[in-house]
Amino acid sequence: MDSGFGSDFGGTGGGKLDPGAIMEQVKVQIAVANAQELLQRMTDKCFRKCIGKPGGSLDNSEQKCIAMCMDRYMDAWNTVSRAYNSRLQRERANM
């Protein structure tokens, strides 16, 4: 019975795991999880803001509201992300 572990971690076949490959895969998994969380939060917030009465389809004003809400959310997220990364770089430079 195969658990599925090991084969995804860049093993060389000799039972040795490459720490660099494992670290890279973990980084990718974290990035995917972060993107999924961002999308879920954006969807939840924009749905609550824009959809008054859920139905079978979105009317024109709901579509526009969703599009604008998502654009603003992503712009805000990008602004915060850039500021955060800039601060991290400054703090690393001061160490």
UniProtKB/Swiss-Prot annotation:
Present at high level in liver and brain, and at lower level in muscle and heart. In CNS sections, it is predominantly present in the soma and the dendritic portion of the Purkinje cells of the cerebellum, but not in the glial cells. Scattered expression also is also detected in the brain stem, olfactory bulb, substantia nigra, hippocampus and striatum (at protein level). The modification N-acetylmethionine is found at M1. Pfam families: zf-Tim10_DDP. Disulfide bonds join C46-C69, C50-C65. One of its GO terms (cellular component) is fibrillar center. It comes from the Eukaryota. A motif (Twin CX3C motif) lies at residues 46-69. The modification Phosphoserine is found at S7. InterPro entries: Tim10-like, Tim10-like_dom_sf. The twin CX3C motif contains 4 conserved Cys residues that form 2 disulfide bonds in the mitochondrial intermembrane space. However, during the transit of TIMM13 from cytoplasm into mitochondrion, the Cys residues probably coordinate zinc, thereby preventing folding and allowing its transfer across mitochondrial outer membrane. This is Mitochondrial import inner membrane translocase subunit Tim13. The lineage of its organism: Eukaryota, Metazoa, Chordata, Craniata, Vertebrata.
